[in-house]
């Protein structure tokens, strides 16, 4: 260790102290973690979970272990240097993060986590302090509590900082899964919006209360297995209805709220994996934005070959209203990726926005009602089954979670949408399937 000169201490944890130092031979700045316990055999050192995990994990969003050395029964880990951690970034923040900034943080966290889980490890101690940041790059650190996914239970019950601890751990489950990491990710995502913890419990019992105060007290219909865990009787003291997350996180979008709700599900089996989370609509940027736009906001879109047109007439009734509901023009692309907005009447075209930079979209169809644009729309019933990002007749619907082809759909788009005349209601915008 003679070649490393300590600059200052930057962290003090349960297992060790962390110092910023530089290599006197190369002048490279590094982070040195000095373990608190004594080691007498080299075999003890290389058998540590943190060493074994970091030897196997090599990813841009996982901190790099450069060297392990032992002197006078003291063990030192030499890591790449990072400027700060996410806790420092949140604490020093004067204004809320933009959604773009939050999305950038979360993509990196989930990418590192997906790699870790796919390579047989789960972290068990995800929290802002263990997410290191340099120039917008985020890396997962501190694998002292990491376990192999294939390892056999029982696991220790005291893992992760309390505020980010999954309920199955609080209830002393001995056979939890990588889903405990996903709970922590949900809590961190919420904190990035509010700059304060979502579940700031003062004790383990208070932590359960704080979770119930947000999610509502679970029962056998919400989390059957959880009701049989050792400490599940604690719920008898907390009979609380769920809160509306829009009230707690007013600056979050519908997609962000939905992702938080799924990640922070009582039942760990309902939480998406890291890979599934990356496919959530919250991360679907550069795609179309389904909301009404004024003509001045309409984007100019590159001209492409004309699409094939089909006129579909469904079973008409005898009343004029039946014809009004059932006559629809269907446009199907002549090839995948067709952009047909240039052939749309101006009053319809102003209702949509396609991002020119979005490449390789799925084959889509658009539907327009063949009725006069000045026909009154106030009496038309709103569709109840659209996903949360859709806007019907200029009004955003409440989230009916799910996008077609996504693992996040409680109810995907109706496959028989046009077999039922009640769903053929004209919509004052273009909808893509």
Curated annotation (Swiss-Prot):
Q: What induces it?
A: Down-regulated by cytokinin.
| Keywords assigned | ATP-binding, Kinase, Nucleotide-binding, Phosphoprotein, Serine/threonine-protein kinase, Transferase
Top enzyme class: transferase
Question: Could you tell me which residues carry Phosphothreonine?
Answer: 156
MF GO annotations? ATP binding; cyclin-dependent protein serine/threonine kinase activity; protein serine kinase activity; protein serine/threonine kinase activity; RNA polymerase II CTD heptapeptide repeat kinase activity
Might you name a Gene Ontology BP term for this protein? Answer: intracellular signal transduction
Reaction it catalyzes? L-seryl-[protein] + ATP = O-phospho-L-seryl-[protein] + ADP + H(+); L-threonyl-[protein] + ATP = O-phospho-L-threonyl-[protein] + ADP + H(+); [DNA-directed RNA polymerase] + ATP = phospho-[DNA-directed RNA polymerase] + ADP + H(+)
Q: Where is the Protein kinase domain?
A: 4-283
Q: Which GO terms describe its cellular component?
A: cytoplasm; nucleus
* Family note: Belongs to the protein kinase superfamily. CMGC Ser/Thr protein kinase family. CDC2/CDKX subfamily.
Q: Which PANTHER family match?
A: MITOGEN-ACTIVATED PROTEIN KINASE
Q: What is this protein called?
A: Cyclin-dependent kinase F-3
Which organism is this entry from? Answer: Oryza sativa subsp. japonica (Rice)
